[in-house]
């Protein structure tokens, strides 16, 4: 379980949010909503431990994330605005590298499957530097198919993804929460209309 209590973030003397409280349990899909500038990305970065908070506490499995940093990071997959892919490596090599550092199943078949799911079949051996920005984003998203982490925190994962790609990702998110995972994301696109699986947390009200 992820617990956020009395969370406050102030940037440039402007309060983005204060005394924010919520709990997210395994099997939940949560969308963070709000206008631009309300602190959605800031919230995700704070929850992952990458951003500073002014007040409040964040716990994972009952422990403050500062005290259980190693376990928390083992359980976390974060995809932010930066893709985090290595431009000098190919798409395939990037995912192989990801497998090696996360002790994932190292089968080549899983990598090919992941790249197919994000529409990069046939581009496996192309250096990432030669891919478009949207394709580089898809290489990063392909990690989701290789992930064993429980907690997925995703900042605008649907950017530059077509309708079919959105459906594929929605199915992946559903399967992840059905298997006891947690997905927290921001997006400007409509998702899971009226789905009981989707819970929304709105910032800026």
Curated annotation (Swiss-Prot):
Class of enzymatic activity (EC top level): translocase
Catalyzed chemical reaction(s): heme b(in) + ATP + H2O = heme b(out) + ADP + phosphate + H(+)
InterPro entries: AAA+_ATPase (IPR003593), ABC_transporter-like_ATP-bd (IPR003439), ABC_transporter-like_CS (IPR017871), ABC_transptr_haem_export_CcmA (IPR005895), P-loop_NTPase (IPR027417)
Subcellular location(s) of the protein: Cell inner membrane
GO cellular component: plasma membrane
Residues reported in the UniProt entry to bind ATP: 34-41
GO molecular function, one term: ATP binding
Similarity field: Belongs to the ABC transporter superfamily. CcmA exporter (TC 3.A.1.107) family.
Role according to the record: Part of the ABC transporter complex CcmAB involved in the biogenesis of c-type cytochromes; once thought to export heme, this seems not to be the case, but its exact role is uncertain. Responsible for energy coupling to the transport system.
Subunit structure, interactors included: The complex is composed of two ATP-binding proteins (CcmA) and two transmembrane proteins (CcmB).
Designated name of the protein: Cytochrome c biogenesis ATP-binding export protein CcmA
Name of the coding gene: ccmA
């Amino acid at each position: 379980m992820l617990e956020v209590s009395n969370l406050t973030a102030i940037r440039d003397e402007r309060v983005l949010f204060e005394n924010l409280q919520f709990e997210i349990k395994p099997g939940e899909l949560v969308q963070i909503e709000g206008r631009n500038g309300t602190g959605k990305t800031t919230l995700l970065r704070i929850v992952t431990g990458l951003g500073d908070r002014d007040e409040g506490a964040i716990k994972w499995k009952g422990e403050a994330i500062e005290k259980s940093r190693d376990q928390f990071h083992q359980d976390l997959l974060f995809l932010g605005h930066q893709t985090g892919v290595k431009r000098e490596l190919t798409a395939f090599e990037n995912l192989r590298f990801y497998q090696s550092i996360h002790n994932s199943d190292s089968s080549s078949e899983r990598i090919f499957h992941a790249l197919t799911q994000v529409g990069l079949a046939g581009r496996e051996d192309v250096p990432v530097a030669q891919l478009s920005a949207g394709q580089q984003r898809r290489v990063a998203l392909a990690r989701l198919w290789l992930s064993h982490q429980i907690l997925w925190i995703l900042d605008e994962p649907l950017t530059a993804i077509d309708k079919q790609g959105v459906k594929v990702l929605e199915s992946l998110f559903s399967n992840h929460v059905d298997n006891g995972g947690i997905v927290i994301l921001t997006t400007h696109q409509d998702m899971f209309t009226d789905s009981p699986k989707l819970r929304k947390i709105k910032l800026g009200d």
